[in-house]
């Protein structure tokens, strides 16, 4: 978590600079106060970039719909479920697939997501079962269940698409994740049409809230990931 890493940095600074410990504590408190109150909105707005609305994608005659994993978690009954807003990605993919089939177009769905949280199922396997329940045909569903990050999402999806014919590629993820995902997919020669499933609203408060820290952490995670992409690109890893 980005905020935990930031806190550890402040703790390390207070240990190294003992004479400045009081100042560091005050600065730490002020920074985390703002991260829970006034900064979530601007950070989310920056991470969202221009992906601020759920768009209606253009269809082709041969459609490839890629759904990126957004994590898994256990509900109060200890059932494994999509984490956070990930269910919106599944719902949107099922809806677009249905529209595609109704217009008698050729379409298939790729779900890309491994098991970085070490749960009983990968993201792709769990999401895939829900897409089957929503009406996606098994023959039109491809599960890519090895990716552990956005880089691997793009790399492994590109490998799958090499042997597939398509004239339109849709990429489904959240507004926060879309900018980083598009950078990764473009780097692998894929130029998908961004299709936002959920827009994170840029909310701000005067007093710190748990949701404020959550939003700040999510936005900073994406912004750090974007910065890392450009560093990796510069040194030739992408």
Show where each model-derived region lies.
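Extracytoplasmic/luminal low-complexity segments enriched in Pro/Gly and acidic/polar residues
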Residues: 216, 227-238
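Structural signal for the C-terminal ends of transmembrane alpha-helices
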Residues: 12-19, 35-36
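C-terminal functional extensions of proteins
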Residues: 221-225
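Membrane-interface elements of multi-pass transporters and channels
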Residues: 19, 46-54, 234-238
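Short, aromatic-rich membrane-interface segments at the entry and exit
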Residues: 2-4, 19-25
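A structural signal for short, hydrophobic/glycine-enriched beta-strand patches
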Residues: 37-213
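Membrane-embedded alpha-helical segments of integral membrane proteins
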Residues: 1-15
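Hydrophobic membrane-insertion alpha-helices, especially the h-region
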Residues: 22-38
């Amino acid at each position: 978590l980005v905020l935990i890493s930031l806190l550890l940095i402040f703790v390390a600074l207070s240990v190294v600079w003992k004479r400045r410990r009081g100042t560091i504590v005050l600065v730490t408190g002020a920074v985390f106060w703002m991260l829970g109150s006034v900064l979530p909105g601007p950070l989310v707005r920056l991470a969202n970039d221009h992906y601020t609305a759920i768009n209606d994608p253009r269809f082709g005659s041969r459609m490839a719909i890629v759904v990126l994993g957004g994590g898994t978690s256990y509900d109060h009954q200890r059932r494994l479920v999509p984490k956070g807003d990930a269910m919106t990605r599944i719902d949107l993919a099922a809806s677009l697939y249905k529209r595609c089939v109704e217009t008698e177009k050729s379409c298939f769905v790729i779900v890309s997501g491994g098991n970085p949280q070490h749960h009983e199922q990968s993201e792709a396997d769990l999401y895939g079962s829900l897409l089957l329940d929503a009406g996606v045909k098994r023959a039109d569903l491809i599960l890519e269940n090895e990716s552990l990050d956005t880089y691997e999402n793009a790399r492994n999806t590109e490998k799958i698409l090499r042997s597939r014919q398509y004239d339109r590629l849709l990429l489904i993820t959240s507004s926060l994740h879309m900018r980083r995902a598009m950078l990764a997919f473009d780097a692998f020669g894929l130029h998908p049409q961004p299709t936002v499933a959920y827009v994170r609203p840029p909310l701000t408060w005067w007093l710190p809230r748990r949701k404020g820290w959550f939003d700040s952490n999510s936005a900073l995670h994406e912004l750090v990931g974007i910065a890392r992409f450009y560093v990796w690109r510069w040194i030739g890893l992408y």
